[in-house]
Amino acid sequence: MEYSTFGRHVAVDTWGVQFDLLNDAEFLKKEMIEAAEACGATVLSVQAKQFSPQGATVLVLLSESHLSIHTYPERGFAALDCYTCGETVDPQIAIDYLVSVLKPEKTYAKKLVRGLGELQVVEPEMKLVEAAK
């Protein structure tokens, strides 16, 4: 079986996020798994690290690639990143879910289309979604 090299990579910087949301690796881990499942991705494993005195990193390894967050609570900043291979899983859905959970004051986003030759950079359409409670 031959697989397509096509992939989509969404990167988002969020600013103005509540300190407590960004400083809780277990909360972020739970929401990252929800985000991955919301876009139809298959979660293979999850690594979460709570830093001292603050900050967290969560990496979700997907069958389709990865979803990650790196936080700087003292700055109200989080870097979100989701890359998926193939056509079936849309990384934008996972990113939209997480942005809806974090409720940032500002977001800056780019979407890369990869695996088709030269990288294509496009402006993603950000949508707020109803996060699970």
From Swiss-Prot:
Gene3D superfamilies xref list: 3.30.160.750, S-adenosylmethionine decarboxylase domain
Keywords from the UniProt entry: Autocatalytic cleavage, Decarboxylase, Lyase, Polyamine biosynthesis, Pyruvate, S-adenosyl-L-methionine, Schiff base, Spermidine biosynthesis, Zymogen
Coiled-coil residue spans: none
Residues the record marks as active site: 65, 70, 85
Reactions the enzyme catalyzes: S-adenosyl-L-methionine + H(+) = S-adenosyl 3-(methylsulfanyl)propylamine + CO2
SUPFAM superfamilies found in the cross-reference section: S-adenosylmethionine decarboxylase
Origin: domain of life: Bacteria
InterPro entries documented for this protein: AdoMetDC_C, AdoMetDC_fam_prok, AdoMetDC_N, S-AdoMet_deCO2ase_core, S-AdoMet_deCOase_pro-enz
GO biological process: spermidine biosynthetic process
Pathway: Amine and polyamine biosynthesis; S-adenosylmethioninamine biosynthesis; S-adenosylmethioninamine from S-adenosyl-L-methionine: step 1/1
Pfam name, any one: AdoMet_dc
Residues that bear Pyruvic acid (Ser): 65
GO CC terms of this entry: cytosol
Homology family: Belongs to the prokaryotic AdoMetDC family. Type 1 subfamily.
Subunit: Heterotetramer of two alpha and two beta chains arranged as a dimer of alpha/beta heterodimers.
Function (record text): Catalyzes the decarboxylation of S-adenosylmethionine to S-adenosylmethioninamine (dcAdoMet), the propylamine donor required for the synthesis of the polyamines spermine and spermidine from the diamine putrescine.
Protein name per UniProt: S-adenosylmethionine decarboxylase proenzyme
Provenance organism: Brevibacillus brevis (strain 47 / JCM 6285 / NBRC 100599)
Lineage, highest ranks first: Bacteria, Bacillati, Bacillota, Bacilli, Bacillales
